[in-house]
Amino acid sequence: MNPSPPSAAATPSSARAPSRFSQFYALTKPRVVQLIVFCALIGMVLAVPGVPTWLDVRLALIACAGIWLVAGAAAAFNCLVEQQIDAKMRRTAWRPTARGQLSNPLTLAFSAGLCALGSWVLYVWVNPLTMWLTFATFVGYAVVYTVILKPLTPQNIVIGGASGAMPPVLGWAAMTGSVGPEALILFLIIFLWTPPHFWALALYRVEDYRKAGLPMLPVTHGNEFTRLQVFLYTLVLFPACLMPFIFKMSGWLYLVAAVLLSIGFSGHAWCLWRNYSDALARKTFRFSLIHLSALFAALLLDHYLI
């Protein structure tokens, strides 16, 4: 499908503003950013013992807003850099930048504006450490991963996953002004979760990545090798998911959830390795989302109920 010509985007003035808003909103990758903010919120909650005060709640809400703004800025910058790649892939061809609906200067200004506003919010209303860690995460994702690693190496997800694993650290820093070992455990869980999550997606989208010229693992090393890596990573992830219980960050409720979810993820990966199908790869990818969301939700419930 050819990108829509500029004239096709013209609408009556009454409809122009909502359409433009939806385009900018799409640039922020809302679903991804929602998961980022959720993981940051878990770090915030675990950093505060007992029932939070109103001041704690206020600080957490402000921190979530600042992190959302900077995460949205990173997503928009990613769309700007990868617009030609996105246009070649079915999964991303709908993005406004890929369709030529937003100019490069406008997209760059939008990304810079969100980043500046979010950084200001975090620096002034939260603390400088959180601002600098969040800005470093922006650079890690938008520049190191998107510009350098992704088009260069099949290990892009492994190395670049460090920026994606930062949200709980940001949340912890927001509430305490420091980075505790508990935050690093949450970082480790997301860091190890990221490769099998993305490689499951890459397995059934391999032709998209091949057409776009991206050296994702299934493109460079083949289907079978990637399936094995997905399975092995879920095995390494399993004990990491038990660490919050081992180090007394959580109780039995989280332990039960972590064991069941980890068995489920490893089970999906085992089936994927032994008997591949696109449908099973898609199912594994979707379960990985359930795994992380439910795991952190269990941490949240355990913190208040046990």
From Swiss-Prot:
Species of provenance: Polaromonas naphthalenivorans (strain CJ2)
Function: Converts heme B (protoheme IX) to heme O by substitution of the vinyl group on carbon 2 of heme B porphyrin ring with a hydroxyethyl farnesyl side group.
Record keyword Amino-acid biosynthesis present: no
Domain of life: Bacteria
Miscellaneous comment in the UniProt entry for this protein: Carbon 2 of the heme B porphyrin ring is defined according to the Fischer nomenclature.
InterPro entries from the UniProt entry: Protohaem_IX_farnesylTrfase, UbiA_prenyltransferase, UbiA_prenylTrfase_CS, UbiA_sf
GO biological process, one term: heme O biosynthetic process
Subcellular location: Cell inner membrane
Entry-linked Pfam families: UbiA
Entry's EC annotation: 2.5.1.141
Primary enzyme class: transferase
Topology relative to the membrane: Multi-pass membrane protein
Alphabetized UniProt keyword annotations: Cell inner membrane, Cell membrane, Heme biosynthesis, Membrane, Transferase, Transmembrane, Transmembrane helix
Gene Ontology cellular component annotations, sorted alphabetically: plasma membrane
Keyword check for Transmembrane: yes
Pathway: Porphyrin-containing compound metabolism; heme O biosynthesis; heme O from protoheme: step 1/1
Stated family: Belongs to the UbiA prenyltransferase family. Protoheme IX farnesyltransferase subfamily.
GO molecular function, one term: protoheme IX farnesyltransferase activity
HAMAP family: CyoE_CtaB
Catalytic activity: heme b + (2E,6E)-farnesyl diphosphate + H2O = Fe(II)-heme o + diphosphate
Listed name of the protein: Protoheme IX farnesyltransferase
Transmembrane segments: 35-55, 61-81, 106-126, 129-149, 157-177, 183-203, 224-244, 245-265, 286-306
